[in-house]
Amino acid sequence: AAWLADTEGVKLSDVASKTSAWQKSDMERGKDYVSELQGENPHQGVKNGVGVDLYDQDSNTFTTVHSMNVFAASYSDYVRSGDGTKASDYILKREKIKAALKAYANALNRAVDSISESIEMSDGTDCQTALEKTMHREKVLIIVVPEEATEFASLLQEIANEIEQETGVKVNITYRDKALGG
């Protein structure tokens, strides 16, 4: 096929590994980041479908992971003078980003409220959880954004702080993988 012409003699796995996570669909990219973070936090992975991706029994912390390409049209405006390869070629839409993060935080609050005294982990075991009346339930929202978004770190942190004040969910912004060319 013509679209494979420049990959002749190259293993498909090598081509796939060079594809930025940010070129994948939202769902595919999100699942990949959840798997990656579950791998980085052994024994904390939660079974799919619970509304929570990680659970730390020691601190009674429920965590969910979402990815957000802040350079996508939904979350930023492209500055026509740039070529789209630098973060400075974009102006972030603060209110759109905040609305999305708040929706994620509210969904996490609902998911945690629906969890009783145990949660099924990704390895199939049931893990005991402490109810709010016994031990405070910490809620953390991890938002994975493109590496280049560090240019907007202060704005993103400001939004994260507002979400925590408004919802009680701590928001951690993490920067992974490049999304822009150049």
What are these regions (language model features)?
Residues 3-182:
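Catalytic toxin/effector domains delivered as secreted proteins or via bacterial secretion systems
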